[in-house]
Curated annotation (Swiss-Prot):
It comes from the Eukaryota. Glycans are attached at N18, N471. It holds the Pfam family MFS_1. It comes from Aspergillus fumigatus (strain ATCC MYA-4609 / CBS 101355 / FGSC A1100 / Af293) (Neosartorya fumigata). This is MFS gliotoxin efflux transporter gliA. It is a multi-pass membrane protein. Keywords: Cell membrane, Glycoprotein, Membrane, Transmembrane, Transmembrane helix, Transport, Virulence. It is found in: Cell membrane.
Length: 542
């Protein structure tokens, strides 16, 4: 997820919260009664906990996945553990934006936290892989509401003069959680159980919800818009959500089945691919028909910056999340590291991302032009992904530390720039909408391409096992957890299977290389513009 940007803070300073978020007529800032002192501190603590929670959940599971595959006896669902969360996180961004506009702000936020907690609870008690995936999907729906709701509550709680600083604090919370996630997940998995990666969400979410419930008092300007329920339903774009979810699920199922569980020419695989195409066309027609009521208002894509920023973040975030989810598998299955050790070993990637994402925001504020950061970040990530492709059974620490550091720097330089660039070229009334659009493409990239990496990994793994160990069932290998290989296989068999794992991971990293390369090319389409330029994107239709 994109961190809150400098430009977003500047935009907020120039508008009343209800103007851009709640859909009401602008009210003078002096009429707003903002909390202060202890009340404000407690509200901010609740919001920081909420954002920490969401950021933590995007990364904490990465180092736990190999151990999860041990318990559920399959490596075929690795991609779904990330994709299910990102898919619903992306698809319900616009829906929650409408919910906060038409329903009471505090109750809506608490409902989002409750939904996230229910999803986390399902994950924590899951007895099989399917239940875990369902829990991740439910948690993603709640996470979408928490992320947008947190910034809405902040806008109604903090005076514009202090809002930029508070937004920066939320960004810091996000970055800390993103770095801590793999470490915490690895520690839980090694010393207790991977289920604590989800149990931990319950007390943190409870504290956040309790603080907001007690201390946040929604001002009159935050009152829900009085609109008939039929109109509210239309504004939610339920048809768009159903069509989009159906299309992406068809595509993900085709990736999961094709080449491993079923042949690519199998009727089920072909049928899901055809269904994906038809549903995607229907979704596009639906969005064009609904216009301003659509999940993704088409008029905003008439501008070069928003179009190419969205496409860039779609491919670029896919590359990032693919590396984040599959490097722990390399460390734990191939190198024999524990879950906690693999969390430490991914620090060059996540630390580089966190540090240079902060730096890129400062640099962009100085130079103004965003294309150089997009291009440089894309080039570094492409090269680093290519270097990670060379990792083998005997690769040393110097290699994986240096390659990850380069990837982290490249990702950090560019990952939040599309959000800042898009926010800089729209008017205040479109700020929340364009933010949701960029976040949608970022999360959708994670959902689709983590699963694409899974397909590449599994297909290659099965092919290598069938080629070199014809007497061993490929299903036996894929049903063996990633960290159980050493105990399940021995001698020559183990050596061949580890080499097959490396070959599968290399194919997954090829996907990351291609995605980062496409993003680099797209960076040139964003245009040589400065975030300090006058806004020129299409104006909202009346």
């Amino acid at each position: 997820m994109s961190r809150p940007s400098i430009e977003e803070s500047k935009q907020e300073l120039s508008s009343s919260p209800n103007d851009s978020v709640m859909g009401k007529d602008p009210a003078p800032e002096e009429e707003m009664q903002y909390p202060s002192g202890f009340a404000l501190s407690v509200i901010m603590a609740g919001l920081l906990a909420a954002i920490f929670l969401i950021s933590l959940d995007t990364t904490i599971v990465s180092t736990a996945i190999p151990r999860i595959t041990d318990e559920f006896h399959t490596v075929a669902d690795i991609g779904w553990y990330g994709s299910a969360f990102f898919l619903t996180l992306a698809s319900f961004q616009g829906t929650w934006g409408k919910i906060y506009r038409y329903f009471p702000l505090k109750l809506s936020f608490l409902a989002a936290v409750l939904l996230f907690e229910v999803g986390s609870l399902i994950c924590a008690v899951a007895k099989n892989s399917v239940t875990l995936i369902v829990g991740r999907a439910i948690a993603g729906i709640g996470a979408a509401g928490i992320s947008s709701g947190s910034y809405t509550i902040l806008a109604f709680s903090v005076h514009p003069r202090r809002r930029a600083a508070m937004t920066g604090a939320i960004g810091a919370s996000f970055a800390v959680a993103a770095v801590a996630g793999p470490l915490i997940g690895g520690a839980f998995t090694s010393h207790t159980t991977w289920r604590w990666c989800f149990w931990i969400n319950l007390p943190i979410g409870g504290v956040s919800a309790g603080l907001i419930a007690i201390f946040f008092k929604a001002p009159p300007q935050a009152r829900a818009k009085d609109v008939p329920y039929k109109e509210i339903l239309l504004q939610m774009d339920p048809s768009g959500i159903v069509l989009l979810l159906g299309a992406i699920l068809c595509f993900l199922l085709a990736l999961q089945w094709g080449g491993s569980a079923k042949a690519w020419g199998n009727a089920d695989v072909v049928g899901t691919l055809v269904g994906f195409g038809l549903l995607l066309i229907a979704f596009a027609i639906n969005e064009l028909w609904l216009q301003e009521k659509a999940m993704i208002p088409p008029r905003l894509f008439k501008g070069q910056t928003i179009l190419f920023s969205s496409l860039f973040t779609f491919f670029f975030s896919g590359s990032f999340y693919l590396l984040l989810y599959y490097l722990p598998t390399y460390f734990q299955s191939v190198k024999g590291a524990s879950a906690s050790d693999s969390g430490v070993r991914t620090l060059p990637l996540v630390l580089g991302d966190g540090l240079f994402a902060t730096l890129s925001g400062a640099v962009l504020g100085i130079i103004g032009y965003y294309m150089p950061l997009l291009t440089l970040g894309g080039v570094l990530t492409t090269v680093a992904s290519g270097l990670l492709y060379t990792l083998d059974l005997d690769s040393g620490a110097n290699a994986w530390i240096g390659y990850q550091a380069m990837a982290g720097i490249g990702i950090g330089l560019a990952i939040q720039v599309p959000m800042m660039a898009s926010q800089a070229v729209v008017r205040v009334e479109d700020l929340s909408t364009v933010s949701a659009i960029v976040l949608f493409f970022q999360c959708m990239g994670g959902a689709i391409f983590v699963q694409a990496g899974q397909a590449a990994f599994t297909n290659k793994l099965v092919q290598e096992v069938q080629r070199h160990l014809p007497n061993i069932s490929a299903a036996r290998v894929t049903s063996t957890g990633a960290t159980e290989l050493q105990s399940e296989f021995h001698g020559h068999e183990l050596q061949v299977i580890l080499e097959a794992y490396v070959a599968g991971l290399k194919d997954a990293f090829i996907v990351a290389i291609v995605l980062a390369g496409i993003a680099t090319l797209l960076s040139f389409g964003s245009g040589w513009r400065s975030v300090k330029s006058k806004k020129e994107e299409p104006k909202a239709q009346p």
